Every structure is written in structure tokens, then in C-alpha cells.
């Protein structure tokens, strides 16, 4: 009898990995499970995701590793873009294809009516969060009430739909696909249901793919299978650099003297910026680099000086 552990390859130790993984999340996998798998494949010491994507949704799930986790909140707050496939004529218990059909109605709308209905939901709108959501009521997720057959009061929340574009409309099949760019906290399931009610026939979501989070897009995103196929030493190279999260912040480059003071948390007066460096406007958050182009952190211009807000150790 042999010891199976003797033939098992030794587990490699974790390592410091810094950057952003643009993951194309597959259908059926939770965001937390995706994070656990990616962290294991990269052998990363520290990782965090930037807001959940439903198991039934696919697409862009940015995962932050190492020093990039200091900026994950920025992606939580960022606008999102989705492509949503909607079936008209039926409402379900969950607002998506996982639920049981509650009511079926005849679809009589034309393309113009669909255009008008969609237009009603652009701009600032109020949404009532769905019962099948992770929002909590008295410390308990709403979906737990829903699974117990209970409906609880939910306060409407203001969200912003920046744009809705109809990509494909097949009214004989009672289906359409729309691209939605929206603020954080927007429920696309609820939007699909609301459009259906505006048309008088009801609707539910049958497919959802996230294509952008802030300035990050699916272009260059990788799958878990693609990471697994790479040699271990090559996997960290699949991450985007930390400053991929900071592209909306103007860059500031410091010389060696100013860099040393900055890394000690000291403010850098406007007059001490290197010659030729354009100072950011008052109140602006800037990404700060050292004299060798290494990201040092972010700082805000306040009262004529750059004040460090978050430092990174790369």
C-alpha cells in the first residue's frame, strides 16, 4: 500500500502578485468562486473582487491583486455596461430565467413602442430592488425571505441609466437585446421587468453579459482556462498593471528628492514639482510616479500642494 500524498506534487508557496486581472467570468460561477480559483492559479497572497456579478451573468469581472486592492472601491463605484437579453410576455418569480413563470401575457407591441418604453428608463430613475437580491433587511439577505415565500417592503433607490441601446429586436419571438450603461446599484433584472410592464406584457431577463466596468472592458480579458493553460511563472504577466485602475487621474512625475518625501507621507508643494511638470488642478486626484516611472500612489492637489492619499509598494 502506497501513500498517495507521496506522489502528489508539492504545493507551491503563495507569492506577491500586483495588478488587475480582467476575467471573463463563465456562466454559473459565483464571483467569490471565481476569485478563489484565480487566486489559487496565481498563488497570490492578497486578492479581492470589485463587486459581484450574478452566477447567471457572464463577462467582465475585474479582480484586484496585491497593491491593486487599495483601489478596488473605485471600481465598485464605477459605471457598468451590460448586454441584456430579455423575453417579453412572461414574468417570473426571480425576474430571470431561473424563476417560475408567474404570468404570461400576449405581446402586441411594435418596434416604436419598444423604443418609447426603453426611453422612459434613461436618466435618473427609481428602482425597487428585487426580492432575489443580496441586499439585507434586518441583517438578513432579501433572497432568504424570498425563498421562504415572504415579500418584505423595499425602499426605492435612485440609480442612473446613462444610455440604453437596442442591439437586436425579434418581436415575433418576443425577445430583444439591449446594451445598458448605468450607475452602480442598478438591477438589470428590474429594468427588464419595468420595460415589460411599460409595454403591458411583462418581461424577464434571459441572458446578461457585462462588457465594461469604468474604463476597463472585455478587450484583453481572459478565462480561467486560459490562465490554467499558462506556465506558472507566466501567469502574473496576464494581469494589467495597478495604474490601469487610475487612468482617469492625471499623471504626476516626481524627482528623487520629492519622491523620498512623498513616500514618507509628506506633501509636495507646487513649487517643488520637477520643471516642466504640469500640476493638477486644485482638488484633483493624481497618480504619482517616481523618477524611474514606478507608481508611488495617488495624491490630491489641495491648497497648492500634493497631499498623499494612498501609497503603494511595488
Swiss-Prot record:
Pfam families: TruB-C_2, TruB_C_2, TruB_N. Its EC number is 5.4.99.25. GO terms for biological process: mRNA pseudouridine synthesis; tRNA pseudouridine synthesis. Coiled coil: none annotated. The active site is at 54 (nucleophile). CDD domains: PseudoU_synth_EcTruB, PUA_TruB_bacterial. Signal peptide: none annotated. Keywords: Isomerase, tRNA processing. It catalyses: uridine(55) in tRNA = pseudouridine(55) in tRNA. One of its GO terms (molecular function) is RNA binding. InterPro entries: PsdUridine_synth_cat_dom_sf (IPR020103), PsdUridine_synth_N (IPR002501), PUA-like_sf (IPR015947), PUA_sf (IPR036974), tRNA_psdUridine_synth_TruB (IPR014780), tRNA_sdUridine_synth_fam1_C (IPR015240), TruB_C (IPR032819). Gene3D superfamilies: Pseudouridine synthase, PUA domain. Responsible for synthesis of pseudouridine from uracil-55 in the psi GC loop of transfer RNAs. HAMAP family: TruB_bact. PANTHER family: PSEUDOURIDYLATE SYNTHASE TRUB1, TRNA-PSEUDOURIDINE SYNTHASE. Belongs to the pseudouridine synthase TruB family. Type 1 subfamily. This is tRNA pseudouridine synthase B. It comes from Cupriavidus metallidurans (strain ATCC 43123 / DSM 2839 / NBRC 102507 / CH34).
